[in-house]
Amino acid sequence: MFQFGESRVAAPDRITDFEIGTDKIDLLNRRGGDIGAPDNFTRAPNNNAPTLRRLVNQVFRNADGGQPGQQELAPNSAVFVRATNPDIRGTYLVINDNVPGFQPQNDLVINITGYTGDLPGFGEIPLEDFFVI
């Protein structure tokens, strides 16, 4: 379970044993109430940003690597991104709350480096594959 406001860009949680296709993520609001799955889930293009904050800002501007051009991360949406810069290398799950734009004190940033299974390709990802519906 992840509660908005707890796994932030300044101090992201880390999951080292996430099993793609088996494990599911359950989301909670700031008061601890269940909010269900995001409305949309995509995989962003791989990103070479030098800091996690810059990576997340760029993902908010281009959240769908399966589409040409840039598609902003919509409110109540989630995205996978692979960071390729050695300083922050890894795979991250970024989840926007219900407020447009990046809210560093509330939006979730979770490091899932160490997952098992195949990371989905760029573009749309079925919600039920990763989230409690």
Model regions and ranges:
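Low-complexity acidic/polar repeat-biased segments
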Residues: L52-I133
